[in-house]
Regions:
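N-terminal glycine-/serine-/threonine-rich beta1-alpha1-beta2 phosphate-ribose binding loop
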Residues: 1-89
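Structured catalytic core of nucleotide-sugar glycosyltransferases
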Residues: 69, 95-98
């Protein structure tokens, strides 16, 4: 399964790192290898393991039939809402930890996901404590 990560700040880079460190365990549980194909960010990351995966146009992800899962880690409502909405409409499963997005547009995104037969998953921690938003 090929995935894309939208945003490569603290959370996005952590997602990529955890996927790489635990790739064997994840592949065993998922029943297939998981590969990060794209990382969407405004910046470049020369000399890093992801430098060849960086893209700047979210539509590349939406239009790629190999991408099954998208992890949104950008934060804020926009452009996250626009990007996530298009991913769901393109038949991609989406996971986010973006509390602002879920609070402002969660009901709408859940409906879009349901209408397109995909999942919109979210979980977050408030104050670094217990996972209270699911």
């Amino acid at each position: 399964m090929k995935i894309a990560v939208m945003g490569y700040g603290t959370i996005g880079s952590g997602v990529v790192e955890v996927l790489e460190i635990n790739k064997d365990k994840i592949a065993e549980r998922a029943g297939e290898p998981i590969e990060v194909k794209y990382v969407l960010d405004l910046r470049e990351f020369p000399g890093t393991p992801i430098e060849n995966k960086i893209i700047h146009d979210y539509k590349t992800i939406a239009q790629d039939p190999e991408i099954g899962i998208v992890v949104e880690t950008m934060g804020g409502v926009e452009p996250a809402f626009t990007f996530v909405k298009e991913m769901l409409e393109a038949g991609k499963q989406v996971a986010t930890s973006n509390k602002n997005l879920v609070a402002a547009k969660g009901a709408e995104l859940i409906k879009i996901a349901r209408d397109h037969g995909v999942n919109f998953q979210f979980a977050a921690r408030v104050g670094g404590g217990l996972a209270i938003i699911r």
